[in-house]
């Protein structure tokens, strides 16, 4: 990601969790932030990039690359007020149409919106599940109020969440599988071996 108010804290928090295998990159601009996430997705990672309204404009071409490449990518848009650079510390929920239609070629993309600080985990989990299982980028909308808010939150039991089952290429497919090969039930398969 590239630091942009009010989304920067997500990058800061994720950077604290390298011991859990989280990899973070602070890029030189919004375009590089999304393009590097697309590269990570192409390499088989669950990729996430964070931004706010003006950054989504800059990321749109790379987001479309993930659409056409059928790559799992989560784009977190922490919305802020106003057009253009806007008001970075003012909370608004004004990027819904941008999230739904803000790309050329009418490329579709699922959109999920978090409703509160306590709902963010569930919304992020579902965004990742949809991205990985359906090989598509997903936009996760939140806003400055939610991003800067806090609430009592009970750590969830992950066993109670629906399993995430990405369509990996299996070892028995080696030699007779191509990245553009269609699957009868879905679009394409993740072209790396399933993690062990």
Language-model segments: residues:
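Conserved thiamine diphosphate
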Residues: 90-139, 143, 165-171, 175
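Thiamine diphosphate
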Residues: 1-102, 107-108, 113-114
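Residue-level detector of conserved catalytic or cofactor/ligand-binding positions
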Residues: 187-196
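Short basic, glycine-rich beta-strand/loop surfaces that mediate nucleic-acid
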Residues: 68, 127, 156-158
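Short glycine/threonine-rich loop-to-helix capping motif typified by GTGT followed
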Residues: 12-17, 150-161
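A glycine-rich, hydrophobic/aromatic-adjacent loop/helix-cap motif
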Residues: 181-185
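A glycine-rich phosphate-binding loop feature that marks nucleotide/adenosyl-phosphate handling sites
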Residues: 6-7, 55, 82, 141-155
């Amino acid at each position: 990601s590239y630091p942009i108010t009010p989304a920067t804290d997500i990058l800061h928090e994720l950077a604290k969790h390298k011991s859990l295998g989280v990899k973070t990159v602070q890029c030189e601009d919004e375009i590089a932030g999304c393009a590097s996430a697309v590269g990570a997705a192409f390499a088989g990672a669950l990729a996430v990039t964070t931004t706010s309204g003006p950054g989504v404009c800059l990321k749109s071409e790379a987001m479309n690359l993930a659409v056409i490449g059928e790559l799992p990518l989560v784009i977190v848009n922490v919305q802020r007020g106003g057009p253009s650079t806007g008001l970075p510390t003012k909370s608004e929920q004004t990027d819904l149409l941008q999230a739904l239609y803000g790309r050329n070629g009418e490329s579709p993309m699922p959109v999920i919106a978090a409703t509160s600080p306590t709902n963010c985990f569930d919304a992020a989990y579902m965004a990742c599940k949809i991205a990985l299982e359906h090989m598509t980028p997903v936009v996760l909308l939140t806003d400055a109020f939610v991003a800067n808010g806090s609430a009592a939150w009970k750590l969830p039991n992950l066993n109670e969440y629906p399993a995430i089952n990405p369509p990996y290429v299996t070892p028995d497919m080696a030699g007779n599988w191509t990245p553009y090969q269609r699957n009868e039930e879905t679009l394409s398969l993740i072209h790396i071996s399933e993690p062990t």
